[in-house]
């Protein structure tokens, strides 16, 4: 049975520097081992920049036995998906969050 799902994710990205010229991160959905068309996102993460929050959501058709994954790639090995501690009394900050919710 195929149903509609809202798929949302966020990544906390950081480029601490240390070499390399690239600043690009791409993220995309993969369903059953195949990249989902038109699901890629590209963002720049500048060296020594503050943390960048990349977020996106999709409405996609998913079957009960489908396997859904999120992939990412960067052209600079120093760029990280990074968790952090809360510094203002709040809880820790997760590196990645993904939510999948049935909408139809």
Regions found by a protein language model. Give the residues of each.
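Extracellular jelly-roll beta-sandwich "head" domains, especially the C-terminal globular C1q domain
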Residues: 2-104
